[in-house]
Curated annotation (Swiss-Prot):
Coiled-coil boundaries: none
Propeptide: 24-35, 65-71
Subunit: Homomer of four to six subunits.
Protein's name according to its UniProt entry: Ceratotoxin-A
Temperature profile: Thermostable. Still active at 100 degrees Celsius.
Signal peptide interval: 1-23
Length: 71
């Protein structure tokens, strides 16, 4: 289940970082882009941790139900 939490964290961080980098940056914009990604990561990590704490119990409860449906 720790892997599930890590996947949520990575997806949320990647989504927010992608929103900061809409177009391919020019060489002079690289510093601005790096700062944008850095600030997005700093803001995304606490949010992702909160979502992971909420989603993990839901996933644990849904897993036996899904396993019963599949097998």
């Amino acid at each position: 289940m720790a892997n599930l939490k890590a996947v949520f964290l990575i997806c949320i961080v990647a989504f927010i970082a992608l929103q900061c980098v809409v177009a391919e940056p020019a060489a002079e914009d690289s510093v601005v882009v790096k700062r944008s990604i850095g600030s997005a990561l700093k803001k995304a990590l606490p949010v992702a941790k909160k979502i992971g704490k909420i989603a993990l119990p839901i996933a644990k409860a849904a897993l036996p139900v899904a396993a019963g449906l599949v097998g």
